[in-house]
Amino acid sequence: MTTTKTHLCHYDQPLYHVGDMNGKPWPTSSMEGPLLSCSPYPEDWRAIARLGQAPIWTLQRLDGKPPKLVNFQRLSRSDKKRWLAKAQELDLIHSATLYKAQAGDDDQYTICLTLEEARQESESWVKPTKGWLPKPALNKFWYGSEKENISPFFAMDAAFTFLAKQIPGIDGIWWDDSYDPGNLSAPRVGIFPEKVKRLRRMHKIILLG
């Protein structure tokens, strides 16, 4: 895929995974889907994701370099258009009219598939919006099954994750969310499963080059 490189970055902060690492693939119920969830703030992430007493694993590359990640927030407008066009070409997503429904504060909202659902979710404002819905191929990538549907809230991110995985040398995705643990928000990283090797005794996760 032809694209600029402003969205490619080396993540030079320490990263941690909070979880048991009992199997592979790991559960796909998180916002990172099939990717291994990591964060520079493990204890905050433990609270946000309600992970209880799960152990903490440190993450490092085999060559000692920082992980190389894609940051979607740094994609230019023209790159986003190209990525969306590619995702549609690959039959990963399709456009749809969705509905924003206020949830909590005035600037917080949820995305609903129908106007009726949106009105049930909110007694305040409801607005139509252009959005994206997953197609079976994207559901299979994200969940391992076409029967589960990705939320419209995450469909574009899931499609971009699929595309980012095709870029040579990339270890995963960086979601540069605001650090606000009180509102269940913190920066997070998803590592592609193929990059992962575990060292159980040292509680380390090694990313293969």
Language model: regions and residue ranges:
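Active-site and NAD+-binding cores of ADP-ribose-processing enzymes
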Residues: 2-37, 42, 46-209
